From Swiss-Prot:
Phylogenetic lineage: Eukaryota, Metazoa, Chordata, Craniata, Vertebrata
Assembly and interaction partners: Hypophosphorylated EIF4EBP1 competes with EIF4G1/EIF4G3 to interact with EIF4E; insulin stimulated MAP-kinase (MAPK1 and MAPK3) or mTORC1 phosphorylation of EIF4EBP1 causes dissociation of the complex allowing EIF4G1/EIF4G3 to bind and consequent initiation of translation. Interacts (via TOS motif) with RPTOR; promoting phosphorylation by mTORC1.
Descriptive protein name: Eukaryotic translation initiation factor 4E-binding protein 1
Organism: Mus musculus (Mouse)
Record-listed N-acetylserine modification sites: S2
Disruption phenotype: Mice lacking both Eif4ebp1 and Eif4ebp2 display increased their sensitivity to diet-induced obesity. Mice lacking both Eif4ebp1 and Eif4ebp2 show defects in myelopoiesis: mice display an increased number of immature granulocytic precursors, associated with a decreased number of mature granulocytic elements.
Outcome (variant: F113A): Impaired interaction with RPTOR
Amino acid sequence: MSAGSSCSQTPSRAIPTRRVALGDGVQLPPGDYSTTPGGTLFSTTPGGTRIIYDRKFLMECRNSPVAKTPPKDLPAIPGVTSPTSDEPPMQASQSQLPSSPEDKRAGGEESQFEMDI
Protein backbone atom coordinates (compact mmCIF):
# COMPACT_ATOMS: atom_id res chain seq x y z
CA MET A 1 0.00 0.00 0.00
CA SER A 2 1.54 3.31 -0.98
CA ALA A 3 1.64 6.36 1.25
CA GLY A 4 0.07 8.54 -1.44
CA SER A 5 -3.18 6.58 -1.80
CA SER A 6 -6.37 8.11 -0.50
CA CYS A 7 -9.52 6.46 0.73
CA SER A 8 -12.61 7.06 -1.31
CA GLN A 9 -15.78 7.85 0.54
CA THR A 10 -19.21 6.82 -0.58
CA PRO A 11 -21.87 9.48 -0.48
CA SER A 12 -24.39 9.10 2.32
CA ARG A 13 -27.98 8.34 1.46
CA ALA A 14 -31.11 8.40 3.53
CA ILE A 15 -32.36 5.07 4.83
CA PRO A 16 -35.78 4.33 3.35
CA THR A 17 -38.44 4.17 6.02
CA ARG A 18 -42.14 3.54 6.16
CA ARG A 19 -44.32 4.75 9.01
CA VAL A 20 -47.38 2.88 10.17
CA ALA A 21 -49.76 4.86 12.34
CA LEU A 22 -51.12 2.93 15.30
CA GLY A 23 -54.11 4.51 16.96
CA ASP A 24 -53.85 2.46 20.12
CA GLY A 25 -51.30 0.21 21.80
CA VAL A 26 -53.85 -2.60 21.67
CA GLN A 27 -53.15 -2.98 17.95
CA LEU A 28 -49.59 -4.10 18.77
CA PRO A 29 -49.53 -7.04 21.21
CA PRO A 30 -46.50 -7.32 23.55
CA GLY A 31 -45.03 -10.19 21.52
CA ASP A 32 -44.89 -8.02 18.41
CA TYR A 33 -42.82 -5.12 19.75
CA SER A 34 -39.72 -6.18 17.80
CA THR A 35 -41.45 -7.08 14.53
CA THR A 36 -42.42 -5.12 11.48
CA PRO A 37 -45.63 -5.42 9.44
CA GLY A 38 -43.66 -7.24 6.71
CA GLY A 39 -42.61 -10.01 9.10
CA THR A 40 -39.02 -8.86 9.67
CA LEU A 41 -37.75 -9.35 13.22
CA PHE A 42 -35.13 -7.21 14.88
CA SER A 43 -33.32 -7.27 18.18
CA THR A 44 -30.52 -5.39 19.85
CA THR A 45 -27.38 -6.62 21.52
CA PRO A 46 -26.27 -5.33 24.94
CA GLY A 47 -23.82 -3.08 23.08
CA GLY A 48 -26.65 -1.46 21.13
CA THR A 49 -26.12 -3.15 17.76
CA ARG A 50 -29.39 -3.83 15.97
CA ILE A 51 -29.68 -7.27 14.36
CA ILE A 52 -32.30 -7.57 11.63
CA TYR A 53 -33.69 -10.98 10.66
CA ASP A 54 -35.51 -11.05 7.33
CA ARG A 55 -38.62 -13.25 7.14
CA LYS A 56 -37.25 -15.14 4.12
CA PHE A 57 -34.02 -15.95 5.98
CA LEU A 58 -35.93 -17.20 9.03
CA MET A 59 -38.17 -19.40 6.90
CA GLU A 60 -35.09 -20.92 5.25
CA CYS A 61 -33.54 -21.57 8.67
CA ARG A 62 -36.71 -23.36 9.78
CA ASN A 63 -36.33 -25.91 6.99
CA SER A 64 -32.56 -26.43 7.38
CA PRO A 65 -31.23 -29.83 8.50
CA VAL A 66 -29.55 -28.20 11.51
CA ALA A 67 -32.93 -27.05 12.83
CA LYS A 68 -34.27 -30.60 12.60
CA THR A 69 -31.30 -32.20 14.40
CA PRO A 70 -31.52 -32.48 18.19
CA PRO A 71 -28.65 -30.97 20.18
CA LYS A 72 -25.84 -33.15 21.55
CA ASP A 73 -26.05 -34.49 25.11
CA LEU A 74 -29.78 -33.79 25.38
CA PRO A 75 -31.18 -35.36 28.57
CA ALA A 76 -33.78 -38.10 28.13
CA ILE A 77 -37.09 -36.72 29.42
CA PRO A 78 -39.95 -39.15 28.65
CA GLY A 79 -42.66 -37.46 26.64
CA VAL A 80 -40.53 -34.38 25.96
CA THR A 81 -37.19 -35.34 24.43
CA SER A 82 -37.87 -39.06 24.06
CA PRO A 83 -41.02 -41.10 23.39
CA THR A 84 -43.10 -42.00 26.42
CA SER A 85 -42.42 -45.36 28.01
CA ASP A 86 -44.99 -48.16 27.82
CA GLU A 87 -45.03 -48.56 31.61
CA PRO A 88 -48.19 -47.33 33.34
CA PRO A 89 -47.52 -44.50 35.81
CA MET A 90 -47.31 -45.45 39.47
CA GLN A 91 -50.60 -44.95 41.28
CA ALA A 92 -50.28 -43.38 44.72
CA SER A 93 -52.79 -44.40 47.35
CA GLN A 94 -55.11 -41.82 48.88
CA SER A 95 -53.36 -42.12 52.25
CA GLN A 96 -50.08 -40.93 50.73
CA LEU A 97 -51.51 -37.79 49.15
CA PRO A 98 -52.38 -34.88 51.43
CA SER A 99 -55.75 -33.49 50.53
CA SER A 100 -57.45 -30.40 51.80
CA PRO A 101 -60.70 -28.69 50.82
CA GLU A 102 -58.66 -25.73 49.52
CA ASP A 103 -56.97 -27.94 46.91
CA LYS A 104 -60.27 -29.08 45.41
CA ARG A 105 -61.96 -26.24 43.57
CA ALA A 106 -65.37 -26.33 41.90
CA GLY A 107 -65.34 -26.56 38.12
CA GLY A 108 -61.91 -28.20 37.90
CA GLU A 109 -59.95 -25.12 38.94
CA GLU A 110 -56.89 -25.82 41.03
CA SER A 111 -54.73 -23.27 42.75
CA GLN A 112 -51.28 -22.80 41.27
CA PHE A 113 -49.60 -22.40 44.63
CA GLU A 114 -50.44 -21.97 48.29
CA MET A 115 -49.82 -18.73 50.11
CA ASP A 116 -49.87 -18.13 53.85
CA ILE A 117 -51.18 -14.69 54.72
